Design a protein with these regions (language model features):
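Metal-dependent nucleotide-binding catalytic modules
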Residues: 3-146
Length: 146
């Protein structure tokens, strides 16, 4: 549900998929996926998703996760942040997105540029090594859950 803003953006902006693919292609430490959308449309799917979730009266911690799901680098880089509920949701979400290869489906990319920027912070936060995460990813994919 965190990407519920994507179909709404598609409906409103005919060239949205082209911009989204560009956004995933240029994502990294210096540029978030939503920065490209903001430049093109003065809004982005995370903002639209946040307001959709609020209008559905979803809990605040869920709406905050939707709003911030492309702000993971800043959130996980800030060690003073005490918002463990947000970090927990985002950690699970970002690992799931990487395992399910959202960067291929939504961004038409062969590489997960966003994960390359944040993966080490996420895994450190949840206490997983790269090796453990690769095993988890393989297990999930073998179960057909990707």
């Amino acid at each position: 549900f965190h990407d519920c803003g994507v179909p709404l953006m598609l409906k409103r902006f005919p060239d949205y998929m082209t911009v989204l693919e560009e956004a995933y292609g240029s994502a990294g430490p210096e540029q978030r996926v939503v920065d490209t959308e903001n430049r093109a449309f003065n809004t982005n799917h995370a903002v639209v998703g946040y307001y959709t979730a609020k209008s559905w009266r979803l809990p605040e911690h869920v709406t905050n996760a939707i709003a911030n799901h492309h702000n993971a680098l800043a959130i996980f880089s800030d060690e003073s942040s005490r918002n463990s509920q947000l970090k927990n949701l985002l950690a699970i979400l970002k690992m799931a997105e990487h395992i399910c290869a959202s960067y291929r489906v939504l961004g038409n990319q062969v590489e997960d540029h966003e994960w390359n920027s944040i993966g080490h912070l996420i895994l450190d936060y949840v206490g997983l090594s790269d090796y453990d995460f690769e095993n988890l990813k393989e297990t999930v994919r073998e179960l057909g859950a990707h």
